[in-house]
C-alpha cells in the first residue's frame, strides 16, 4: 500500500526479476524506504571495516570510501565510522557540485583523494574527466583548485592523479589512456606544468606557515 503496488508476499521482493517502483510524489514512502535501506547498508559496510581495522591494525586512520559521487546517506555512514571523508573530485574547484556546508556538519576532515586536469593536445588521446583546451591551461587550473581547497576549512589535503600519463593503448583495467600526468609515457616531464605545480605548492606551504605563526 505504501508503495502503491500489489504484492502477494514479502518474499517476492527477493525475486531477481522484481523491480521496485520509482520514487514519486504520490508515494513518498518509496524514497524514504530507499534512503533507510541505503543508510543501513552503508552502516553495515563501514562498521565491518572499522571493527576489523581496530582489531587487526589499531591506531591506524581509516580514510573513508573515496567517493566518486556524494550520496548523503552513504557519506553520513562514512563519517560515523571513519576518521576522514575522502572524495575523488573531478571538478574545476572542490566546491563545484559538493555541499561543503553539509560536509562540515558531519564534523570530519575531508581528503580529496583524486583530482586532475588533462588536455588532448599533448600525450595520449584522452583529456580525462576534467579536460582543458590546451596544455598551458593545466597549470592555472591546478593553482585555482589548490587555492580553493585551502580556502575550505574542512579540507586537509589533496592528491593529484597521477604522476605518469596513462599508456597510449590504454591501461589494463579499463582502457583509460589519459594525458594528466606530470611526466609523459617516455618519462619526460611536461616542464611548464611541473614548474606551475611547484610554484603553487610552494605558495601553499608558505601560506600554511604564515597561518601557523
Where are these regions (language model features)?
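Aromatic- and acidic-residue-enriched carbohydrate-binding clefts of CAZyme catalytic domains
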Residues: 1-32, 121-123
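Structured segments of extracytoplasmic/periplasmic soluble domains
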Residues: 2, 6, 52-56, 148, ...
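Helix N-terminus capping/helix-initiation residues
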Residues: 9, 64, 133-134, 190
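General small-molecule cofactor/ligand-binding pocket signal
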Residues: 13, 63, 159
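Residue-level preference for long, well-ordered alpha-helices that form the structural scaffold
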Residues: 26, 30, 34, 38, ...
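Glycoside hydrolase catalytic-domain groove-lining segments
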Residues: 36-51, 55-128, 143, 147
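C-terminal structured "cap/appendage" subdomains that terminate the fold
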Residues: 129-179
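Aromatic-rich peripheral "rim/lid" segments of glycoside hydrolase catalytic domains that contact
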Residues: 161-213
Amino acid at each position: 500500500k505504501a508503495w502503491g503496488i500489489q504484492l502477494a508476499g514479502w518474499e517476492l521482493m527477493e525475486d531477481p526479476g522484481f523491480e521496485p517502483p520509482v520514487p514519486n510524489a504520490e508515494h513518498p514512502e518509496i524514497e524514504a524506504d530507499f534512503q533507510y535501506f541505503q543508510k543501513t547498508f552503508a552502516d553495515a559496510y563501514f562498521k565491518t571495516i572499522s571493527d576489523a581495522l581496530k582489531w587487526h591494525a589499531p591506531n591506524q586512520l581509516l580514510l573513508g570510501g573515496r567517493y566518486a559521487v556524494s550520496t548523503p546517506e552513504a557519506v553520513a555512514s562514512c563519517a560515523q565510522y571513519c576518521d576522514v571523508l575522502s572524495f575523488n573530485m573531478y571538478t574545476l574547484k572542490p566546491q563545484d557540485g559538493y555541499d561543503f556546508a553539509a560536509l562540515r556538519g558531519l564534523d570530519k576532515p575531508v581528503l580529496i583523494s583524486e583530482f586532475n586536469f588533462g588536455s588532448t593536445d599533448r600525450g595520449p588521446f584522452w583529456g580525462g574527466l576534467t579536460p582543458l583546451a590546451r596544455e598551458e591551461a593545466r597549470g592555472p587550473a591546478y593553482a585555482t583548485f589548490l587555492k580553493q581547497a585551502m580556502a575550505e576549512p574542512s579540507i586537509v589535503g589533496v592528491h593529484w592523479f597521477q604522476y605518469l600519463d596513462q599508456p597510449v593503448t590504454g591501461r589494463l583495467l579499463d582502457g583509460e589512456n589519459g594525458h594528466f600526468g606530470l611526466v609523459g609515457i617516455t618519462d619526460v616531464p611536461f616542464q611548464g606544468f611541473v614548474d606551475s605545480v611547484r610554484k603553487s605548492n610552494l605558495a601553499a606551504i608558505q601560506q600554511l606557515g604564515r597561518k601557523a605563526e
